[in-house]
Amino acid sequence: VLSFSWLQNTKATKEGINLSNNSFLFISAWDDSIIKKIVSGILDDPTMFCGIKVSGVQIANTPDFKNSTSFLMASPVLLKWRDNGALRYVTIEDEDFEEKLNINFKNKLQNAGLDTEGIKISIDPNSTYRQTKMVTYNGIKNRTSLVPIVIEGTTEQISFAWSVGLGNSTGIGFGALK
């Protein structure tokens, strides 16, 4: 299970995305061996997509998080939910966004063999920033959300969230935290 951000420090134009010398993205994973494989692949071939080449790699340790930590989204959260067999996209416009986000994350914790007790994810009450965004991936339109959040729990639970991201499809660039 891993997470990666969208490109940061870029400028969108009609012609496409312009990168600068300080543009970057980050990749995080709960299992360090995944990061080692990714870094090895980048070092073998630094070409990414659309002619972008990696010019440097920095490896950082997981920060020491407090039992309540605020995060911004480095990529929008994709949250899909099945209601009576029908798939729906849950966004910040839905009353049950926080509830479904918590259930989704508790499932990730449980699947990783980690404790789910005491974890709580909520929209940051000190921020008025809220945005929904339609993101097309492989021809599929996905309704996503960008919103500052607060995660309360153990340092292990919060570190796990930071490492694997929130919501669905974190391995293809959704739900990364910064």
Feature names for model-found ranges:
Residues V1-K178:
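RNA-interacting cores
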